[in-house]
Amino acid sequence: KKTDNILKIDIRDTDLKSIEKCLNNIFTEHKDIRIVFVTNSRVSKVAHFIDSSKKDVILIGYDFLKENIEYMDKGIIDFLVCQKPKQQGYRGLISLYQHLAFSSPVEKIYFMPIDILTKENSAFYRN
């Protein structure tokens, strides 16, 4: 689905072969792709394709995972959005505890910080 200059694709099969096949078709049809944003932690699989096919794109993804960091260190992944999962879990449990123990109202929306990692700052990040 293409909206103006944004092409949205949804790859349901997440094995490497399926991802590579889909991306190969997309890059063949759309030779002007400059930025790829993967909205889940499987950005390393897209990075594998980008690396092996020598595509010159900016690659953005999610999560401070070993395989993602390895591709970031190689310069394939440019940015990772990290969401502090331990802090998210802690906030959820505290909210539940306060509601059950003290009948405190549960906030429907609780904004959490995110961190943007680059090759230059990832070595100093504590998730």
What are these regions (language model features)?
Residues T3-D4, V57, D78:
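A structural micro-motif
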Residues R12-K66:
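Hydrophobic alpha-helical
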Residues K74-K86:
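Short beta-strand elements at the ligand-binding edges of bilobed clamshell
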Residues K1-K17:
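Short beta-strand elements in bilobed, periplasmic/extracellular small-molecule ligand-binding domains
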Residues L65-K74:
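Flexible loop/hinge segments that line or gate small-molecule binding clefts
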Residues K84-N127:
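Hinge/cleft segment of the Venus flytrap/periplasmic-binding protein
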